[in-house]
């Protein structure tokens, strides 16, 4: 359930080329859906893509000035703990 500090969202397949568009949507709607943590999760074989997309997502968030933390992970179980929403 969403708390006053914002939500934790986990994106399975975070190395996808569609992820930056998702991040842009969260940034634009931050006032209505404050995302405090966005976990981008992918498989080990997708490491290079996840790192590239994750770096872009971090730059987007920094430029927008929203207090959203981008976390990259290859461990679904860790990422899904206490998640408010999950996207795939």
Which sequence ranges carry the predicted segments?
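Metallocofactor- and cofactor-centric catalytic cores in central/energy metabolism, strongly enriched
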Residues: 2-88
């Amino acid at each position: 359930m969403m708390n006053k500090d914002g939500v934790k969202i986990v994106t399975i397949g975070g190395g996808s080329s569609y992820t930056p568009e998702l991040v842009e949507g969260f940034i634009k709607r931050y006032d209505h859906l404050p995302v405090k943590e966005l976990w981008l999760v992918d498989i080990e074989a997708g490491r290079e893509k996840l790192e590239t997309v994750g770096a872009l997502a971090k730059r987007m968030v920094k430029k927008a000035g929203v207090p959203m933390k981008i976390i990259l992970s290859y461990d679904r179980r860790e990422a899904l703990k206490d998640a408010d929403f999950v996207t795939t």
